[in-house]
Amino acid sequence: MVAKNIKYNEEARKKIQKGVKTLAEAVKVTLGPKGRHVVIDKSFGSPQVTKDGVTVAKEVELADKHENMGAQMVKEVASKTADKAGDGTTTATVLAEAIYTEGLRNVTAGANPMDLKRGIDKAVKVVVDQIRKISKPVQHHKEIAQVATISANNDAEIGNLIAEAMEKVGKNGSITVEEAKGFETVLDIVEGMNFNRGYLSSYFATNPETQECVLEDALVLIYDKKISGIKDFLPVLQQVAESGRPLLIIAEDIEGEALATLVVNRIRGGFRVCAVKAPGFGDRRKAMLEDIAILTGGQLISEELGMKLENANLAMLGKAKKVIVSKEDTTIVEGMGEKEALEARCESIKKQIEDSSSDYDKEKLQERLAKLSGGVAVIRVGAATEIEMKEKKDRVDDAQHATIAAVEEGILPGGGTALIRCIPTLEAFLPMLTNEDEQIGARIVLKALSAPLKQIAANAGKEGAIIFQQVMSRSANEGYDALRDAYTDMLEAGILDPAKVTRSALESAASVAGLLLTTEALIAEIPEEKPAAAPAMPGAGMDY
């Protein structure tokens, strides 16, 4: 077993503080409209330029193992906030440092760390309740654009694109961010359900130029097994041919005689048909086929449910206004399923998302929900250089997450103003705490609430304490606009923060800072000293 180095009490806390401060100093310069960039060296390729707090935090690794523990714990604050709300990572880091630094001062002065933590937790609950009270729901396209613009570092182009995407696909829709080939940043909307499986034969294409198969007013056959023989398949094909409507077949696979028959029918100018493989794998495939069945108002023909392909009839088939199949993907537009069944399916998927503990499963469920309920929007980020594109993509990601958070829990006056407006409520709560150290813990949170505003002001070259006093003396929604160096009504000016982001930042910061304050010992491995390399033999330098 490797020997360990142990630090106790005051020495341990000093090491943690140094690690926390080192990481926070690197992250907090990015806060606010006048926040600076951080350039990160990469082992390959060009350096990364970013203003994203969590990206900066993830890159910090300190040489001193004990200091590194403090840095890693605060890194966790940024990561947890990013996971919960997708934005607000810099605010969370600033709050964590403020709570820990002030808490440490009190622990050193003799306060009980456990009581301090209890006081911090109680104060955070009061502030979170107040945040929920003062938040207002997002109602207009304009407000969504404002939230996205602020989160994208005041880039109105990005803000408007995200607002447009949200409007097109709805709050359950999926917005993905990709790198574009050119200079322009553009928005593509894929309406209806789209999955990445194309036709099984190019003979199915109806448009030779685009190489797409377009079926109008189509029937949809959904089967969860392979189709290879034509015998079982023929009865339903004859019924479809008699109906005169085109047919989309989705099955695990279609091969041999069955595929050959469909291709020959297509070449000879028979009824329009297209065959595609089912999307997904395993249990996820079955769930996606059920989604398609509900969307189109058809049935999943499955032998597990006692159904056989040979007994299938027109009533079991789904219906869609339009189906577009390319070489690589399939889009079903305006499936004619029942609205109630579709809503029930969406609610069921939402419940699964809440219950799931796996990030991968959540992501896949979210994709299914988006495809069922709204559609998919793709924002393709373009820029003149790769470095600029990556930096811009980071900002688009932040803005997208902030917008989703705003729709979920509403909006607050931005620029750190909302936390300042919670100070009177917390002051009124203090006398209710009878334990003196718990009261000190609550006062630590009280003081920390002004830290984000002070940091925004400092990054704009102003004195944070003076700006704080000015904002405190003003009415509810009035705050400091660092971009224009003016005091204004933040809601009217469109300087907004999502309530979920502010709440998550405070909760994550207080949680980790509280743990650090109650730490009394640090254990780290003693780094092994590697022997110096032997000097080169004479003549080994090859200097002829």
UniProtKB/Swiss-Prot annotation:
Q: Per its UniProt entry, what is the enzyme's top EC class, as one word?
A: isomerase
GO biological-process terms attached to the record? chaperone cofactor-dependent protein refolding; protein refolding; response to heat
Q: Return the InterPro entries for the record.
A: Chaperonin_Cpn60_CS (IPR018370), Cpn60/GroEL (IPR001844), Cpn60/GroEL/TCP-1 (IPR002423), GroEL-like_apical_dom_sf (IPR027409), GROEL-like_equatorial_sf (IPR027413), TCP-1-like_intermed_sf (IPR027410)
**E.C. no:** 5.6.1.7
Instruction: Give the CDD domains listed for this entry.
Output: GroEL
Give start-end ranges for the coiled-coil region(s): none
Summarizing the annotation, the consequence of altering residue 255 to V is: In strain: L2
Q: Subcellular location, in the record's words?
A: Cytoplasm
Summarizing the function annotation, the protein's role is: Together with its co-chaperonin GroES, plays an essential role in assisting protein folding. The GroEL-GroES system forms a nano-cage that allows encapsulation of the non-native substrate proteins and provides a physical environment optimized to promote and accelerate protein folding.
Family membership: Belongs to the chaperonin (HSP60) family.
Q: How does it assemble?
A: Forms a cylinder of 14 subunits composed of two heptameric rings stacked back-to-back. Interacts with the co-chaperonin GroES.
Protein name in UniProt: Chaperonin GroEL
State the organism named in the record: Chlamydia trachomatis serovar D (strain ATCC VR-885 / DSM 19411 / UW-3/Cx)
